[in-house]
Curated annotation (Swiss-Prot):
Homodimer. May also form higher-order oligomers. Interacts (when phosphorylated) with ARRB1 and ARRB2; the interaction is associated with internalization of C5aR. Interacts (via N-terminal domain) with S.aureus chemotaxis inhibitory protein (CHIPS); the interaction blocks the receptor and may thus inhibit the immune response. Residues 1-37, 94-110, 175-200, 266-282 are extracellular. This is C5a anaphylatoxin chemotactic receptor 1. It comes from the Eukaryota. The chain crosses the membrane at residues 38-64, 70-93, 111-132, 154-174, 201-226, 243-265, 283-303. GO terms for molecular function: complement component C5a receptor activity; G protein-coupled receptor activity. It is a multi-pass membrane protein. The gene is C5AR1.
């Protein structure tokens, strides 16, 4: 049984050749946690406190705005994905504290980590959807004014959640629990039954659809958007654009270690020194990725307005100011007028 997960929502392995410490008591595990695990626990605790409160506030604000603004629909779904991910943190926290022992049973082993993965991939795909929406606002403003509606936005969000569900299915199907006796513990993880090709195929598909493809989408969309908006004075009011770019940048900075170590572990042999090192850093990489779940509300508040204004306004007011559609609509209309005027000038010249 080569593939087995200790701590992460999906990546990780069990190695039958792990060295058994003969000095370890049979009736209990070591009382000492590794340094990476301790750092992961600290990060998990901070992310849980900030992420649950912050994303709950974003959900509360955008739930009212989503009835009339498309921008709020995007951020509502993104906040829901992050909020649910943060709610699952006590599960990972408990497992690490108990030296990766899984006390929740077999059914929970299949369901709970898979739900964490679902919310993670939903967050990724929603970010790509938001970037595509921003691209259309800048380059197809007239089309957006005619066809960009709340119904279409909700459909796009449903597609993102559906694709995230498909990416999560392997985790649900291949998760099992394994009982160990030296020291006694129950491990929850993914078991591909020595099928390395299947394991690598799943890892590659998730890397492409859950990371590289969204990354390419974001890079293309925002490169063209930045070039276009900064080439015209009339479209340089980009408050929402700055917020989304900050959210996207933070996402890939914090998720990159998880993705890199995950794909490396799927191709390495469990007995290799590199694999063993990555396995020790596993919890830390997951906790680093989880920072993204709590940093988005902070970005929204900081981007709201100047420091003095932040002191004078309440948090809900600041979030409402950032997450509403007004600045986006003004930018789109401004660019549309600029495009029409340019076409008129060319017609007169002919």
């Amino acid at each position: 049984m080569d593939s087995f997960d200790y701590t992460t929502p999906d990546y990780g392995h069990y190695d039958d050749k792990d060295t058994l410490d003969l000095n370890t008591p049979v009736d209990k595990t070591s009382n000492t946690l590794r340094v990476p695990d301790i750092l992961a626990l600290v990060i998990f605790a901070v992310v849980f406190l900030v992420g649950v409160l912050g994303n709950a506030l974003v959900v509360w604000v955008t739930a009212f705005e989503a009835k009339r603004t498309i921008n709020a629909i995007w951020f509502l779904n993104l906040a829901v994905a992050d909020f649910l991910s943060c709610l699952a943190l006590p599960i990972l926290f408990t497992s690490i504290v108990q030296h990766h022992h899984w006390p929740f049973g077999g059914a929970a082993c299949s369901i709970l980590p898979s739900l964490i993965l679902l919310n993670m991939y939903a967050s990724i795909l929603l970010l790509a959807t938001i970037s595509a929406d921003r691209f259309l606002l800048v380059f197809k403003p007239i089309w957006c004014q005619n066809f960009r509606g709340a119904g279409l936005a909700w459909i796009a969000c449903a597609v993102a959640w559906g694709l995230a569900l498909l990416l999560t299915i392997p985790s649900f199907l291949y998760r099992v629990v394994r009982e160990e006796y030296f020291p006694p513990k129950v491990l929850c993880g993914v078991d591909y039954s020595h099928d390395k090709r299947r394991e690598r195929a799943v890892a590659i598909v998730r890397l492409v659809l859950g990371f590289l493809w969204p990354l390419l989408t974001l890079m293309i969309c925002y490169t063209f958007i930045l070039l276009r908006t900064w080439s015209r004075r009339a479209t340089r009011s980009t408050k929402t654009l700055k917020v989304v770019v900050a959210v996207v940048a933070s996402f890939f900075i914090f998720w990159l270690p998880y993705q890199v170590t995950g794909i490396m572990m799927s191709f390495l042999e469990p007995s290799s020194p590199t694999f063993r090192l990555l396995k020790k850093l596993d919890s830390l990489c997951v906790s680093f990725a989880y920072i993204n779940c709590c940093i988005n509300p902070i970005i929204y508040v900081v981007a709201g307005q100047g420091f003095q204004g932040r002191l004078q306004k309440s948090l809900p007011s600041l979030l409402r100011n950032v997450l509403t559609e007004e600045s986006v609509v003004r930018e789109s209309k401004s660019f549309a007028r600029s495009t029409v005027d340019t076409m008129a000038d060319k017609t007169q010249a002919v």
